[in-house]
């Protein structure tokens, strides 16, 4: 016991010696510290970023100028990906099919596309996963031509007619089929025509080559303002989406191979952070903010039209990137009804999306 006491006293003496030998802070030191604290008081708290497994990311998208992918555009234009340490290269695919092929072949790391594509891949035993949601409604409207369907009264009048969709098998095709079925018209009783999402679709409707159209923004608003179309079903709103699908319908998302997500969790988190940051910005963005941020070419030579289209889809944008609880089930049911090769019992819904990244980003950005 005596030995232990001596050790204690010896340690105490060393502690006192160390304290006495430490230089006392001078007035200059105190002033410097105060200035440093004052200088950093207004700066945001920096979040320590874990090391990214992959910093250079190839992302493929079909129709990036569409409002369907506005969160991606905003995150890119405002430098949110760079801020997260991501060197993002966005490649425009010629079609949804081409975008799908790019990500499934490994030519692209990530795809910005419809959640339905993930369900379709999973039904074929190709394991892909959505890791952040951009849209909580499809933003697609179905309308009839005012030229060839003048005096339109009922969906039954569309039997035997030509219906324009962005692409065969696309969300616009699925929605057109559902709307027709609700009106007693089978999809095989009409002729679907792939017209894309650009000016060519408008020209086809304007010249009488189409009798109806199912498409996305800003194309629909442009056709409405020109008096070329009369909208009869609208998933640009949450209410309209429930009317068509009976529940929430997830739309655009970022998705990748499940193995890629598992091996690159920090990278996926960084990309999710960028998208959720963009989604939060969009919640309060005014017309001037949109005009200053979105590339001029996306406006199709009409800023007013683009802003009108934005307001029509605004509520369809996800507020936080999180997949809604009933969304996957609603989407799978719609896919199974549209495509007989998609079997509900063959798709494990929990494996088609990952909410962990979005939940963390939501907390970080208070989205």
Regions inferred by a protein language model and the residue ranges of each:
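N-terminal export signals
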Residues: 22, 29-48
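Short, glycine-/small- and polar/acidic-enriched structural segments
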Residues: 49-197, 204-217, 221, 228, ...
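Short Gly/Pro-enriched turn/cap motifs at secondary-structure boundaries
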Residues: 63, 244-245, 323
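Secretory targeting signals
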Residues: 1-25
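A generic alpha-helix surface/boundary motif
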Residues: 75, 115, 174, 254-255, ...
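Pocket-lining segment of extracytoplasmic ligand-binding domains
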Residues: 200-295
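Conserved C-terminal helix/tail region of periplasmic/extracytoplasmic solute-binding proteins
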Residues: 332-367
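Secondary-structure end/capping motifs
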Residues: 261-342
């Amino acid at each position: 016991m005596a030995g232990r006491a001596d050790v204690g006293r010896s340690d105490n003496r060393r502690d006192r010696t160390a304290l006495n030998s430490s230089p006392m802070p001078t007035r200059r030191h105190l002033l410097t510290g105060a200035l440093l604290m004052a200088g950093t008081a207004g700066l945001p708290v920096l979040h320590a970023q874990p090391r990214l497994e992959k910093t250079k990311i190839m992302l493929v998208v079909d129709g990036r100028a569409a409002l369907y992918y506005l969160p991606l555009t905003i995150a890119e234009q405002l430098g949110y990906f760079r801020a997260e340490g991501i060197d993002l290269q966005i490649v425009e695919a010629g079609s949804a099919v081409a975008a799908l092929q790019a990500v499934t072949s490994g030519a692209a790391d990530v795809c910005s596309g419809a959640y339905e594509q993930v369900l379709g891949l999973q039904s074929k035993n190709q394991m892909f996963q959505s890791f952040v949601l951009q849209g909580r409604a499809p933003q697609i409207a179905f309308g009839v031509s005012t030229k060839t369907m003048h005096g339109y009264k009922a969906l039954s009048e569309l039997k035997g007619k030509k219906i324009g969709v962005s692409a065969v098998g696309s969300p616009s095709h699925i929605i057109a089929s559902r709307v027709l079925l609700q009106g007693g018209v089978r999809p095989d009783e009409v002729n679907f025509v792939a017209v894309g999402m650009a000016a060519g679709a408008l020209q086809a409707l304007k010249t009488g080559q189409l009798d109806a159209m199912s498409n996305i923004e800003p194309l629909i608003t442009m056709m409405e303002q020109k008096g070329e179309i009369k909208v009869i079903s609208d998933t640009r709103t949450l209410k309209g989406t429930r009317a068509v699908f009976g529940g929430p319908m997830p739309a655009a998302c970022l998705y990748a191979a499940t193995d890629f997500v598992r091996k690159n969790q920090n990278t996926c988190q960084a990309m999710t952070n960028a998208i959720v940051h963009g989604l939060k910005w969009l919640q309060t963005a005014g017309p001037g903010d949109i005009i200053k941020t979105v590339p001029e070419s996306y406006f199709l030579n009409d800023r007013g039209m683009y802003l009108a289209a934005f307001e029509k889809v605004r509520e369809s944008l996800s507020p936080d990137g999180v997949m809604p609880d009933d969304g996957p089930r609603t989407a799978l049911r719609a896919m199974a009804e549209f495509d007989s090769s998609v079997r509900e019992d063959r798709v494990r819904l929990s494996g088609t999306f990952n909410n962990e990244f979005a939940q963390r980003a939501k907390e970080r950005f208070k989205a």
